[in-house]
A protein has these predicted regions:
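N-terminal topogenic module of multi-pass integral membrane proteins
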Residues: 2-98
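Membrane-interface helix-boundary motifs at transmembrane edges
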Residues: 27-30, 93-106, 160-171, 221-223
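Juxtamembrane "helix-exit" motif on the non-cytosolic side of transmembrane helices
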Residues: 54, 94, 123-132, 185-194
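Transmembrane alpha-helix entry/boundary detector in multi-pass membrane proteins
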Residues: 66-76, 103-108, 131-148
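Hydrophobic cores of alpha-helical transmembrane segments in multi-pass inner/ER membrane proteins
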Residues: 75-88, 146-158, 204-217
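Transmembrane alpha-helical segments of multi-pass membrane proteins
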Residues: 103-118, 171-182
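Membrane-proximal helix-loop-helix units in multi-pass membrane proteins
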Residues: 113-173
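Terminal transmembrane helical module of multi-pass membrane proteins
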Residues: 159-223
């Protein structure tokens, strides 16, 4: 092989995207489609809500406990919840050209970590203290809490950025989300884990994201 051919081959390999680059290019293309992202958000909200009531009319059981008897549905719960939030947070950032700021970079990292944690959570079955598996129990609850914390942090990063620009409507959203998270922690400390308490911040997050992405008052003003 001639030197010119080697250089040409090296140039072609350099231009070929890595698996990581190909994945992010795919996500970037998907988040160009407003209707696609909206459909996922609505589907995620519906599936999350229906799943929470399976054998659980009083919402006493958490998603993890339901997953013990319905493991396949638990995986689908992760798919619908994880993908709908991941796509729509990326859509939110792109819609508002929220890319280069430090908070945007922080939010993007949190979104990826939240996506990873929700799938890690469903692959570590929930156990109780009496089962004698403390490490598994700790790993399951750690990934469950981190999934919620990372996705919440990604939304808060955007709302905080807008609030720093003195946008009243975004400040209201930020305060609403913050109070919801505080309320959840207080209720968990008082009543212990519960499907109803677990669902409240997810429902609020879905509603906030829908308003930010798809309602007229929150659409960015075009120059």
């Amino acid at each position: 092989m001639s030197k010119a051919s080697k250089l040409k081959k090296q140039a072609e390999l350099a231009q070929k995207p890595t698996v990581k680059q190909a994945f992010f290019n795919f996500v970037d293309a998907m988040t160009d489609n407003r209707n696609f992202c909206m459909a996922w958000l609505i589907a995620g909200f519906i599936f999350f809500t229906i799943y929470g009531f399976i054998d659980n009319p009083d919402l006493a059981k958490t998603a993890s406990v339901i997953g013990k008897t319905h493991p396949r549905l638990f995986i689908w719960w992760a798919v619908f919840s994880g993908v709908s939030l991941y796509l729509n947070i990326h859509y939110l950032y792109k819609l508002n050209s929220f890319k280069t700021e430090k908070l945007a970079k922080f939010g993007n990292v949190c979104t990826c970590l939240g996506f990873f944690c929700i799938f890690a959570c469903v692959h570590i079955p929930s156990v109780e203290p009496e089962d004698g598996k403390p490490l598994q129990m700790a790993a399951h609850w750690a990934t469950a809490l981190l999934f919620a914390a990372f996705f919440a942090a990604a939304i808060i990063a955007f709302l905080l950025y807008k609030s720093m620009q003195k946008s009243v409507k975004h400040i209201i959203m930020l305060v609403t989300l913050a109070l919801t998270l505080i309320l959840m922690v207080v209720l968990l400390l008082i009543f212990g884990k519960s499907g109803g308490i677990e669902s409240i911040p997810m429902w609020v997050a879905y509603i906030i994201i829908f308003m930010l992405n798809y309602t007229k008052p929150f659409q960015p003003v075009k120059d």
